[in-house]
């Protein structure tokens, strides 16, 4: 039996898509020296090669992939977006204006220099900026410009041609730039991300070692009785000195939970709970006594639970005011908006904060009831919330603003980004709502991005050879200039005028360019999601400005002579 692979792939969009993804992901794992190509470039190269062989895919797949990615970016950025935006919103607006404004001016200059018409110039701007809103804005303005039909048809054709010829140039150049531009500065992105995390209490080091408390039991001997000198447990302050807590005492065969007034006596058997290093700090008079291995005395179920702060008697209080150790519990982590914070007695608790607490199961339950509730982890995604907010995002994207003779809309991407931010923000403040496991979120985000890249390559590859004629070289040069020069200008402005943190700055630059694949590379370089906060800050603003740029370039073109 003969199988025609070309016909098989052409007749099955789903098969073609996953063949492209599989081959591209394999290619992305290849290394050239110390440089790994990466998934984005691997999928793009494979899809471009197959696109040149006239394989095509339904454009709905491209759109769905991009929308899933943008929505997930919003969900990840949501917990901290508003605190970051209200603090840096002016900077994000100015960065987006500098990026879009400089690209617009450069594109107009190059268009006049090479003698192109408005269609090629606007298409080159849209492609170099990898921005569909520019294309939409320019096309809509051309249709309402009053051109005669033949001239309008040529301009619209050239608009698409310019976009097709420069889109890949803009995308690849920015992806490469995102990988190497951070290395040209003195401060690496990982350090910058850690710096902003420390400054704003967004400690993202989730790999910190956390030890569970352990239980050891000792028999009180003469040395220990002499050390206590008749003082009760409150006066001894064993926890303050060592970090260990006397959980139980067996006296005359009777087990009891001691209070602060208890005094240790000869022959008592005591169970101490604490971290390993806390046991090491105990006075030698504890350890010199005979250690006891008593099943009943040591029979404690140590658990670690995540307690959500909710009750009014805990919200607004300092961490020290909870007095967890007085209740035999140990604090391991403080998590706010899905970001781990430094453990500090002066941290003021907010509603929705998550405290990771260890201790005896009964004591942890008592503490949880007092300050909130125990978070029940699940590996099941709240698909209802996911789908509902996705629909809300699409509806927001349909909103259109009309100004005299031109109009611009939010677009699906901006709407979904905003909806994702809202879902992430609400999940952070109401942990029982909209739960999405991080693994599921990462998988959907990565899959959406790869589908988008596959669609771009297959769509652009089929027609790119047709445009490489007399203007091919000019388009390559112009595309590179418009793609990279505004990025450099934006970096200099953000770094030396606005003095922004580098991790937020690079994320914001990728958002101002509305380039999702490049943002993913920046996040990988920083080994943090903090750049996504900057990306989300400029993305929605840039989408509006880019739509206006498409309109403005058509409107000012005739006046340039």
UniProtKB/Swiss-Prot annotation:
Q: Which chain regions cross the lipid bilayer?
A: 8-28, 32-52, 66-86, 94-114, 158-178, 383-403, 406-426, 451-471, 475-495, 540-560
The chain positions of domain RCK C-terminal read 200-288, 292-373
InterPro entries in UniProt = AAE_transporter, RCK_C, RCK_C_sf, Transp_YbjL_put, YidE_YbjL
Q: Name one GO molecular function term.
A: monoatomic cation transmembrane transporter activity
Pfam families registered for this protein in UniProt? Asp-Al_Ex (PF06826), TrkA_C (PF02080)
One GO-annotated biological process of the protein: potassium ion transport
Enumerate the subcellular locations listed in this protein's record, separating them with semicolons. Answer: Cell membrane
Give the matching SUPFAM superfamilies: TrkA C-terminal domain-like (SSF116726)
Q: What GO cellular component entries does it have?
A: plasma membrane
UniProt entry keywords in alphabetical sequence:
Cell membrane, Membrane, Repeat, Transmembrane, Transmembrane helix, Transport
Q: How does the protein associate with the membrane? A: Multi-pass membrane protein
Annotated HAMAP family: YbjL (MF_01015)
| Similarity remark | Belongs to the AAE transporter (TC 2.A.81) family. YbjL subfamily.
- Designated name of the protein: Putative transport protein YbjL
**What organism is this sequence from?**
Escherichia coli O1:K1 / APEC
Q: Lineage in the entry?
A: Bacteria, Pseudomonadati, Pseudomonadota, Gammaproteobacteria, Enterobacterales
Q: Which gene encodes it?
A: ybjL
